[in-house]
């Protein structure tokens, strides 16, 4: 099992849904980087369940304990160990269905790989609960990126068949204004168009009342990345962002910029024309989402991820009793989200921050953290 992402800047995660704690170790941060625990807490709060019919009744405090690597609000340059206690656990909910494979979950694949030694309580290490560690570690990196002039944010582009206003892919100024609006809001329901919030919430609650669930699409924007970050082929910007994006449970698809829409365009329509804006090279359009040949060109990076409906539903399903080796009906117990899309928005933001932080460190070393306002002028 590989629990580490990143090479120049790496996060290792640990824990299970119903274990004593979950957490991570962030390695590669320079010494002297400010760490705002209030900012980390705010990110965690956007992910936290509220027991409001829109998310799981399992409400956790999600207080992040920084065990090492941070003193007096600054990094020491050593590994940052962080831990989040699991305090609201009801493992008994899973006892009656322990031998039944839950459709859409990793029960069967985990059994095939780990031969019954996996922790199956609440999904164990496969649970979305583990994304709390991604948010905690990613928030530290996101704070450092923000100080270097790089902003990352995510909104709910679509949920339960209802769409929000999309990001302005071809208008960098309008996109920056949209990002500013989203970052100014503290609530965990990230939308640009406030008029679709109640219809979305109503649809989520309706699915939950029927014992069902719904999915959606998240849209993430990355502003301020300098040109020249990334590698061709295997460590391309798309490759590393996708690597992290698919590490968020329930994500089943991704596209950058115009994405699958390229299939219906001609080359004359798909190419982004270059032009000068002062001393900077920009593109007239941004179909390619700020990436050419796996390397950033300085334009905004925009990508969308498809999030499947929560697989834990309360409707009876057909499955298999893998101990008795026979077909069986399944009625899931426990506490589950009717939709994880709203809570997953901050997870995708922090996942992207980890990928971008690794890319930036591979390109600039730790200079972007140590000298966030001047590293671009140093000719690195």
Each model region followed by its residue ranges:
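N-terminal, positively charged regions that mediate nucleic acid binding
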Residues: 1-58
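Glycine-rich, mobile lid/loop segments that gate access to catalytic sites or pores
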Residues: 113-230
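Glycine-rich anion/phosphate-binding loop at the beta-strand->alpha-helix junction
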Residues: 14-20, 135, 210-327
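A short glycine/serine-rich beta->alpha loop
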Residues: 10-15, 118-130, 227-231, 288-291, ...
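Glycine-rich, N-terminal phosphate-binding loop and its surrounding beta-alpha-beta segment
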Residues: 43-109
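Alpha-helical support elements that line or immediately flank enzyme active sites
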Residues: 20-32, 128-150, 235-243, 299-301, ...
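Internal helix-turn-beta structural module
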Residues: 312-380
